[in-house]
Structures are given as C-alpha cells and as structure tokens.
C-alpha cells in the first residue's frame, strides 16, 4: 500500500533496482510461497502476470542474462564502472575470462532438459575453470558480461518466469491441478526451440509437484533459489561422482576452432563437512551467525536461547 500502483521508477537500466508496485507484489508472492501461504502466493503471482506475462524468446534467453531492459525482468541491478565491485560475484559466472568461470553445472543435471529445450544448449561446453586452469568441468553459457572489457553487467533479481512457477505450485496446493499443469506448460512451451512442442504434462499427485520443483531448478539455475527450495521443501542435496573423457573446444581470435581431449569432472564435495551423507533438514543448509557476532552481541540470545542444533 505504501508503493502507489502508478509509481514510475524510470526506464533506464540503473533505475531497475527500485521497487515499484509490480516488484512489491512479486516479493509478496515469493514470501508467501516460502511461508506456505498458498492462496496469497497464488493471488500475488497472478496479479504480477496480469501486468506482465512476457516470457523471453530463445535469442533473449541466450543473450547472457545481462540486460535490465529484457521484457521478462521485473527487478534487477545494473552495475556501472563507478560502482564498488568488492562483492561483485557476477565475475565468477562468466566463463569467457581466464581465471573466472567457476560457476559450473552438474553433468547429470543437464540430462533433465528435454532435447528440444533451448536452455540445454547453454550447458554443453567443457573447459578449464578458475581453479588453476587444470580442472575441466561443464561450464555454463547462461551468464555473460554485458561489458567484458570492464567486467560489468546487469543482474536479474526477479523474472516473470518465477511468477509462473509460484502460481503453478500454489495452484497445485490449492487443488487446482488442471491450472497448475496449464501454467507449468505455458513456461515449458516458451522454452522449446522454434517449431517444437513441449511434451504433454501427464503427471498427477506428488509427481506433478515434483515436476514443478524440477522446472524451478531448470528455469532458475544459477539465480539463487536452490538452497531455499531445498530447505522449504525438506529435500536433500543430490550429487553423484562424475569423471570421464570429454572434448574441449577452443576458438582463437580469428575464429579457428581446435579440440582437445581431457578428463571432465563433476562435484568435488559429495558429503557434508563432517563426512556424513547429504540429508534433509541439515544444519549445514543454514547460514550461521558468525562467532564474533555471538561473542560481541550479548543480547543475541536474550529472548531465544541458542539451540543445541547450532552448537
């Protein structure tokens, strides 16, 4: 109510960090999803999509996720050369600069994309990562610098696709199965290559819910939702060891492509820090309060005693 519906934040990319009425409703939809308030999540996601139902084209999706002017972006941050980059983590998402590109994808995860899904094309290049130039992993082509010479780009904070997924999940819990399928299918069809049709959604019951959760992983990969979804849905991290022969392709400044055989690897960490297997509801999924903060803030546990779970 404090943000007028007609409030205009501006159209310049540097204005997209401001929260307008649509973004506020998106935040409410996201918050309600996390709180398992399904009707509120459904209502606000629906209102956002009434204002902006747009979903990216294939060309836009493959352009690097680096432009706040993208019609699907509801909220974003546009970095400039004048900004401080002390915590500018986008540097580690772009594979094109030597010493960076450490945000890699699980080779097994890519198998979840349909062959006609153009998102799958973004996870096909094996190459050397930031870790000393010796480790070969499956790199991501989803994120790219807008200005590679200066290492800056725009970063998305909220997209309409998230609203489709919130609406689909909320509809499922509200027992609107047909609508949940319809909303989910709308997003899946939008991610098919030109002339291709998304497979019919035949899943029912818990299988339909799992299909919605999987689509969140496929659509929002690398955008910061995975750990929250694992916690709220009481799921477990799933990782398998991967090591096998792969082909690395490199292109020089003249466009000549050379290939090299190498041994590709997947995750290094396959268990928790204490050596136990991954499981739901682990304390390792939670962000911890730094020890110095606990020592210096005498009132930290004044009203709520520190649980043994966190010791």
Briefly describe each language-model feature range:
Residues 1-89, 113-311:
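Acidic/polar-rich alpha-helix caps and helix-coil junctions
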Residues 95-110, 119:
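Short, cationic low-complexity segments
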């Amino acid at each position: 109510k404090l943000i007028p519906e007609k409030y205009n934040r501006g159209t310049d990319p540097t204005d997209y960090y401001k929260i307008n009425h649509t973004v506020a409703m998106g935040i409410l939809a996201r918050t309600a999803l996390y709180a398992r308030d399904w009707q509120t999540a459904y209502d606000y996601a629906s209102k956002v999509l009434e204002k902006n139902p747009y979903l990216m084209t294939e060309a836009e999706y493959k352009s690097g996720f680096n432009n706040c002017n993208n019609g699907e972006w509801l909220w974003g941050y546009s970095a400039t050369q004048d900004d401080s980059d002390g915590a500018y983590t986008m540097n580690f998402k772009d594979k094109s600069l030597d010493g960076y590109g450490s945000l890699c994808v699980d080779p097994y995860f890519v198998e979840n994309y349909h062959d006609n899904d153009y998102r799958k094309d973004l996870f096909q290049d094996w190459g050397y990562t930031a870790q000393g130039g010796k480790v070969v992993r499956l790199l991501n082509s989803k994120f790219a610098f807008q200005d590679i010479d200066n290492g800056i780009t725009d970063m998305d904070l909220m997209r309409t696709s998230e609203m489709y997924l919130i609406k689909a999940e909320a509809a499922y819990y509200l027992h609107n199965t047909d609508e949940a399928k319809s909303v989910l299918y709308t997003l899946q069809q939008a991610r098919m290559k030109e002339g291709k049709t998304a497979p019919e959604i035949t899943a029912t019951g818990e299988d339909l819910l799992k299909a919605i959760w999987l689509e969140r992983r496929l659509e929002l990969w690398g955008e910061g939702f995975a750990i929250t979804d694992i916690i709220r849905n009481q799921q477990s991290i799933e990782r398998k060891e991967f090591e096998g022969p792969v082909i690395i392709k490199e292109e020089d400044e003249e466009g000549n492509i050379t290939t090299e055989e190498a041994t590709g690897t997947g995750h290094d960490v396959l268990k928790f820090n204490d050596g136990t297997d991954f499981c739901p509801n682990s304390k390792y999924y939670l962000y911890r309060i730094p020890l110095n903060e606990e020592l210096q803030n005498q009132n930290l546990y004044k009203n709520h005693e520190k649980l043994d779970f966190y010791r």
